[in-house]
């Protein structure tokens, strides 16, 4: 948090949110693909 005054909080929150969505998306996509291939 050394650049707390220079980096807008909304930008940090947006990047963090996109990262979480990307990880969850890949996780659910992998689970869905694995489930589909196993059936």
UniProtKB/Swiss-Prot annotation:
Its main location: membrane. PSII is composed of 1 copy each of membrane proteins PsbA, PsbB, PsbC, PsbD, PsbE, PsbF, PsbH, PsbI, PsbJ, PsbK, PsbL, PsbM, PsbT, PsbX, PsbY, PsbZ, Psb30/Ycf12, peripheral proteins PsbO, CyanoQ (PsbQ), PsbU, PsbV and a large number of cofactors. It forms dimeric complexes. One of the components of the core complex of photosystem II (PSII). PSII is a light-driven water:plastoquinone oxidoreductase that uses light energy to abstract electrons from H(2)O, generating O(2) and a proton gradient subsequently used for ATP formation. It consists of a core antenna complex that captures photons, and an electron transfer chain that converts photonic excitation into a charge separation. It is found in: Cellular thylakoid membrane. This is Photosystem II reaction center protein J. GO terms for cellular component: photosystem II reaction center; plasma membrane-derived thylakoid membrane. InterPro entries: PSII_PsbJ (IPR002682), PSII_PsbJ_sf (IPR037267). Keywords: Membrane, Photosynthesis, Photosystem II, Reaction center, Thylakoid, Transmembrane, Transmembrane helix. Belongs to the PsbJ family.
